[in-house]
Amino acid sequence: MMKKIDVKILDPRVGKEFPLPTYATSGSAGLDLRACLDDAVELAPGDTTLVPTGLAIHIADPSLAAMMLPRSGLGHKHGIVLGNLVGLIDSDYQGQLMISVWNRGQDSFTIQPGERIAQMIFVPVVQAEFNLVEDFDATDRGEGGFGHSGRQ
């Protein structure tokens, strides 16, 4: 299913020097987001920084949200993940997409201008209304939590 999402280019290099976000393959779930930087940024181990994308989106449809996720290769090979682990973009947000980048690795990492640094997916949203109750209907699991079902 394809859905039209309004995008505003905030940095004139986007669409020229830096490509617009695209799906890498026909089966890709995530759009690659690029670091819209003037100069390379070096991240020491344990450091975080906010990286601009040069883009703003307006989803408008309250039944959708966007999520920013780390790119698997950067996380696995270099320890580069999102500082907030997952970025959530609400349907009514219209500001620049910023990527919180965290170097959880052992070595410094340099983010280059235009580098693909995160990915964004669109997900359905259900807004819940709480129904106050005294007790829940009984289930087999009950209050069994962490480790409840074992490892095997």
From Swiss-Prot:
GO terms of biological process kind: dUMP biosynthetic process; dUTP catabolic process
Molecular function terms, GO-annotated: dUTP diphosphatase activity; magnesium ion binding
Q: In which pathway does it act?
A: Pyrimidine metabolism; dUMP biosynthesis; dUMP from dCTP (dUTP route): step 2/2
Which cysteine residues pair off into disulfide bonds?
none
Keyword presence, Transmembrane helix: no
Protein keywords: Hydrolase, Magnesium, Metal-binding, Nucleotide metabolism
EC number(s) on record?
Answer: 3.6.1.23
Question: Hey, which family's this protein in?
Answer: Belongs to the dUTPase family.
- Function of this protein? This enzyme is involved in nucleotide metabolism: it produces dUMP, the immediate precursor of thymidine nucleotides and it decreases the intracellular concentration of dUTP so that uracil cannot be incorporated into DNA.
Name recorded for this polypeptide:
Deoxyuridine 5'-triphosphate nucleotidohydrolase
Q: Which organism is it from?
A: Escherichia coli O157:H7
